[in-house]
Amino acid sequence: MLETPKVLLKNLQDCKIHFIGIGGIGISGLAKYLKAQGATISGSDIAISPSVKYLKALGVEINIPHDPKAINNQDVIIHSAIIKEDNTEIQRAKELEIPILSRKDALYSILKDKRVFSVCGAHGKSSITAMLSAICPAFGAIIGAHSKEFDSNVRESANDSLVFEADESDSSFLFSNPFCAIVPNTEPEHLEHYDHDLERFFFAYEYFLDHAQKRVIYKEDPFLKNYSKDAIVLEKKDIYNIQYILKDGEPYTSFELKDLGAFLVWGLGEHNATNASLAILSALDELNLEEIRNNLLNFKGIKKRFDILQKNALILIDDYAHHPTEISATLKSARIYADLLDTQEKIVVIWQAHKYSRLMDNLEEFKKCFLEHCDRLIILPVYSASEVKRDIDLKAHFKHYNPTFIDRVRKKGDFLELLVNDNVVETIEKGFVIGFGAGDITYQLRGEM
């Protein structure tokens, strides 16, 4: 059965709202957006983060760490998923009988009166959301990553139209009130939330699509190709004449879409053209075609997605890909980029698996995803994301790559140091290196830890 959200009778934009865990990417996005909508915002977290600094600069009062004294006369408390019932601020809010909403429940109250372009899928949703927000600059945007166009995960706006990155991992996408539902793929993941029931998992996607007034789907997906209700459909054959270029040193994909002409979008790979095409098709009723074509050029990528950190003797790329399908697609992009640069360097991959559950569920696919375009594989310890450690013999499972196992990687100037037991065992001074993972590898590659 599908969950029913807790509903707050008051409009959140008229409320005093306290966010517990305000530094997280999801919660900070809601806080930034609601402040722009007129709400009075306060918050707390356990540590300073870039989002906390940004909100403080806007005048938002934020307590570090959590403090029950911060809870006084607010109309509602919104907390992130990791906040537990025994949190001191949660306990104080209960004493004062202040309504408490999880982020998931708050979504419905925030979005119920909005014209939401809701993007959901296993892969590509951050990119599509950022591309569509570039195409429609008057719309608000809440993205699960930082758009380089406006250097934030949120574009604050008083506009009722909103581009929103929805999340299937906790089924909160069902609370996103989609005016337009945009789905690139439905590859099963996060099945633990759906009790490993595929029927329940796909029913959630069907419900999401059914409740939108407008639907944009990629029909090469095995589930979406059988979706029967009216939808704007993208098929692989609709995208043609794909070419890759460097423009002012930056990578771009050129392609033609249906009978709409040629488009140019930042980034490389067929998947990049597919993501851009879904964003374009979603905007056809919003802007004229030339505005769409020109505005798409404002998309400059998103942080941690084929994020080119440096391009000198050592080309260094950070990518959030943490699923075999994503890794395989991004490695193809890396090979295209290497060819455009006319470098003869081999592609070195540093991989940090994210969550034992994902690694075990997709182990056979992980064992294959590096076969193409990876010349050397370096493996970091699994990033558990608070999961209980599980025994898995990575050396045995990945022996066909003859991988290098290290404890961590450290950025030092323009070089990378590989460490085992806090000893530097190798320094990479030149070449082509791409890091994959959704854990702390991004901070290791950036020299931030």
UniProtKB/Swiss-Prot annotation:
GO BP term (any one): peptidoglycan biosynthetic process
Subcellular location as annotated: Cytoplasm
Molecular-function annotations in GO: ATP binding; UDP-N-acetylmuramate-L-alanine ligase activity
Catalytic activity: UDP-N-acetyl-alpha-D-muramate + L-alanine + ATP = UDP-N-acetyl-alpha-D-muramoyl-L-alanine + ADP + phosphate + H(+)
Residues engaged in binding ATP: 121-127
Domain of life: Bacteria
Gene3D superfamilies in alphabetical order: Mur ligase, C-terminal domain (3.90.190.20), Mur-like, catalytic domain (3.40.1190.10), NAD(P)-binding Rossmann-like Domain (3.40.50.720)
A single Gene Ontology CC term: cytoplasm
Pathway: Cell wall biogenesis; peptidoglycan biosynthesis
EC number: 6.3.2.8
Main subcellular location: cytoplasm
Keywords attached to this entry: ATP-binding, Cell cycle, Cell division, Cell shape, Cell wall biogenesis/degradation, Cytoplasm, Ligase, Nucleotide-binding, Peptidoglycan synthesis
Assigned protein family: Belongs to the MurCDEF family.
Cited function: Cell wall formation.
Descriptive protein name: UDP-N-acetylmuramate--L-alanine ligase
